[in-house]
A protein has these predicted regions:
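Beta-strand/beta-sandwich contexts
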Residues: 1-23, 55, 64-105, 148-189, ...
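Residue-level recognition of beta-strand termini and adjacent short loop/turns
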Residues: 2, 41, 123, 207, ...
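Short, solvent-exposed loop/linker segments at beta-strand-coil boundaries, enriched for Pro/Gly
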Residues: 31-36, 78, 113-118, 162, ...
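Surface-exposed, short loops/turns at beta-strand junctions within beta-sandwich domains
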Residues: 49-55, 131-137, 215-221, 297-303
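Short, conserved beta-strand segments of beta-strand-rich sandwich/propeller modules, principally
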Residues: 55-57, 95, 138-140, 222-224, ...
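Conserved structural position at the C-terminal beta-strand
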Residues: 60, 143-145, 227, 309
Length: 329
């Protein structure tokens, strides 16, 4: 007999095979007559199952008597109540867990109209399924058993892979703690932001195209910044960890209080200089190399003043420049 099970509502057409069936006068599912039956040949009968419950013997009666019984099981309709997780990448390949009732004997799991790549019936209340690929957006999930079908509309959401287009500012100190803005698309579902393999100290999803993140500490040099969502992990954008500038000499170390001359700073990590302060006031400067900066002196009161250099990597320790007053007679 094929199939050997069907819904409690009946209506399933089954094929009975055997011998001596040509003169069949009745087909019964337990004590209930088939809704209808057709004798195809002496070895085949098709019958429409009536409504019923449980497992019952199917018998054929002819003028020669009643046959042995073949078991037919009435299966309750499946009930699908949940999908977890509820979202994943458009490429598919991830595993989800379907929960509900009467899931034993499932013959199909579909996402929209597409069959699951594979599925396993774990118990009457649980199925695990490998999600197929699809376009971004919500989709219904359906489970089919001999007892019928159950669909959860828009139960699963396909998420596009995030794309990063920029990080601003693109550099900062080794100690981290500064905030950067990541731009791109498909960022709204972000679950992680990483600098290399280190998670951002914190991040905020501003919109589908923007995230702000607090940079963790890192080693000097370039590192990859990535964003992860249920849709996958983005391409890498570059961020540079810069060591703090170091000023070792200031030549000449003194000059007229009226300004109008230049002095040269030597040291390391000076190439990214954004500000030079002389006595707390911004001075004009020219970056000659990573180890040299030429600074325009500012007029001011006679006496010593501090000189510092600031880059995205931090601010140097102060050096002293002395303003010398004009001689008087």
């Amino acid at each position: 007999m094929t199939p050997t099970s069907g819904p409690t509502a009946g209506g399933t057409t089954v094929t009975l095979t055997g011998t001596g069936l040509a003169t069949a006068s009745a087909v019964r599912f337990g004590a209930t007559p088939a809704a209808s039956f057709t004798v195809v040949s002496d070895t085949h009968i098709t019958a429409v199952a009536p409504a019923g419950t449980g497992t019952v013997p199917v018998t054929v009666t002819t003028s020669g008597g009643t046959s042995n019984g073949i078991s037919y099981t009435y299966s309750a309709a499946p009930i699908l109540s949940g999908v977890s997780p509820t979202q994943g990448p458009t490429s598919g390949g991830n595993t989800v867990t379907l929960t509900g009732a009467n899931l034993t004997g499932a013959t199909a799991v579909t996402f929209g109209a597409t069959p699951a790549t594979s599925f396993t019936v774990v118990s009457p209340t649980q199925i695990t399924a490998v999600v197929p690929a699809a376009t971004a957006g919500p989709i219904g999930v359906t489970v089919t058993t001999p007892g019928g079908t159950s669909t959860l509309p828009s139960a699963y959401f396909y998420v596009s892979t995030p794309v990063l287009t920029g990080v601003a500012p693109p550099s900062g100190p080794l100690s981290g703690g500064n905030t950067v803005t990541l731009t791109g698309v498909h960022l709204i579902e972000a679950t992680a932001v990483r600098f290399g393999t280190t998670a951002a100290s914190a991040f905020t999803v501003v919109s589908d195209t923007q995230i702000t993140a607090v940079v963790p500490a890192g080693a000097a040099g370039l590192t990859d910044v990535t964003v992860s969502t249920a849709g996958g992990t983005s391409n890498a954008a570059s961020y540079t960890y810069l060591p703090a500038p170091v000023v070792t000499t200031l030549i000449p170390s003194q000059g007229p209080a009226s300004g109008g001359i230049t002095f040269t700073l030597t040291g390391t990590n000076l190439a990214q200089a954004t500000t030079v302060l002389v006595g707390g006031a911004p001075a004009g400067f020219t970056v000659v190399s990573d180890s040299h900066i030429v600074v325009d002196t500012l007029p001011g009161a006679a006496g010593p003043v501090t000189v510092t250099v600031t880059t995205p990597g931090g601010t140097s320790a102060p050096k002293t420049y002395t303003r010398v007053g004009s001689p008087g007679i």
